[in-house]
Curated annotation (Swiss-Prot):
Keywords: Membrane, Transmembrane, Transmembrane helix. It comes from the Eukaryota. The chain crosses the membrane at residues 39-59, 136-156. One of its GO terms (cellular component) is membrane. Completely overlaps YHR219W. This is Putative UPF0479 protein YHR219C-A. It is a multi-pass membrane protein. Belongs to the UPF0479 family.
């Protein structure tokens, strides 16, 4: 079981990330996932390929969650395969698993757990952190994310 202090540290980190990504996490939703020993990030990278250096974003996430590696498996969804291959050692070092929602996973099914949906791909926070021009209107981010979630649910329905 994760120590209580570490639980609070992780919760604060996630809440901070969520605020920067314009989405607030509820304590109850997050704490439910402690019993699963799993944190899942659903990052819609497909609209972000030309806007965000994926490697820098992932390195930032890895650094923030290295301390929870003994307690959690952290999954990233829909990471372009070329980035996944290049970052395999980095992801493995933090027990971060990569799953592509648009191809068959190891067990032939699209994972159904999407517990934490952080808007970190094109958020103003990451744009500022990595000196990326933030030119995408927020309305389009919402459209992309709704579309992405719809695709994930559709893919999961097809496989079940």
């Amino acid at each position: 079981m994760m120590p209580a202090k570490l639980q609070l540290d992780v919760l604060r980190t996630l809440q901070s990330s969520a605020r920067h990504g314009t989405q607030t996490l509820k304590n109850s939703n997050f704490l439910e996932r402690f019993h699963k020993d799993r944190i899942v990030f659903c990052l819609p990278f497909f609209p972000a390929l030309f806007f965000v250096p994926v490697q820098k974003v992932l390195q930032h996430l890895c650094l923030r969650f290295t301390q929870v590696a003994p307690y959690f498996i952290i999954q990233l969804f829909d990471l372009p395969s070329r980035h996944a291959e290049n970052l395999a050692p980095l992801l493995a070092s933090c027990r971060i698993q990569y799953t592509n929602c648009f191809s068959s996973s190891s067990n032939g099914q699209v994972p159904s757990i999407i517990s934490l949906y952080l808007r970190v791909d094109l958020s103003p926070f990451y744009a500022k952190k990595f000196q990326i021009p933030y030119r995408v209107p927020m309305i389009w981010l919402d459209v992309f994310q709704v579309f992405f979630v719809f695709l994930v649910i559709s893919q999961h329905s097809l496989h079940s």
